[in-house]
């Protein structure tokens, strides 16, 4: 019996060692050679790729390594709430001016302008932006900058968004789950 346990332990050790060695020898994930990448002094990693199609359109994304996993129990939902607040005023686009500007150039909220929060990331996107005028790309990059570091978090907007978040939670959560959580 001792011999059996010893052999099992040795086999487990060898399998574990082989798995560790194998995982360290995995090749890197292939990257698209047309994607330019870099890292800014502030730690932001960027990826830029030129596309010919669709013509005169661009997509903009900012992905932050923050999500619900970083919340304490008394902060539950805060990451999602901040995601919503990005559309309610920033330093360079106060109040509703962010939506108004993007809609004026053909970007529709909820279709081409959206965001999501998951366990470990929050991603904002502005898609299918018609880059037909000078300054549109710069404005979209400024929006990404503001989303990363310059939300206004106006108390009136916070109160308005609180109701939106509550209704979103209510419609996505079944009655039994809501009763369980209260």
For the regions a protein language model found, what residue spans apply to each?
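Short alpha-helical segments used as structural interaction elements across diverse proteins
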Residues: 3-4, 33, 159
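Bacterial N-terminal signal peptides that target proteins for export
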Residues: 1-10
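Mature N-terminal segment immediately following signal peptide/propeptide cleavage
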Residues: 28-63
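Boundary at the C-terminal end of the N-terminal hydrophobic targeting segment
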Residues: 21-23
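Active-site-adjacent, His/Asp/Glu-enriched structural segments that form or flank metal-binding
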Residues: 64-181
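Short, linear, compositionally biased motifs with a strong N-terminal bias
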Residues: 14-15
């Amino acid at each position: 019996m001792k011999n059996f346990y010893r052999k099992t332990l040795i086999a487990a050790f060898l399998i574990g060692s082989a798995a560790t060695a194998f995982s360290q020898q995995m090749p890197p994930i292939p990257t698209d050679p047309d994607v330019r990448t870099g890292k800014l002094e502030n730690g932001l990693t960027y990826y830029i790729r030129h596309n010919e199609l669709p013509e005169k359109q661009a997509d903009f994304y900012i992905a932050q390594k923050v999500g619900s996993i970083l919340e304490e129990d008394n902060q539950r939902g805060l990451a999602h709430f901040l995601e919503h607040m990005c559309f309610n005023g920033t330093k360079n686009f106060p109040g509703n001016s962010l939506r108004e500007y993007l809609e004026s150039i053909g970007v529709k909220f909820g279709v081409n302008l959206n965001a999501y929060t998951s366990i470990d990331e929050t991603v904002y996107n502005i898609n299918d932006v018609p880059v037909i005028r000078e300054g549109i790309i710069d404005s979209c990059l400024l929006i990404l900058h503001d989303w990363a570091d310059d939300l206004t978090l106006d108390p009136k907007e916070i109160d308005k968004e609180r109701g939106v978040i509550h209704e979103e939670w209510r419609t996505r959560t079944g009655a039994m789950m809501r009763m369980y959580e209260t």
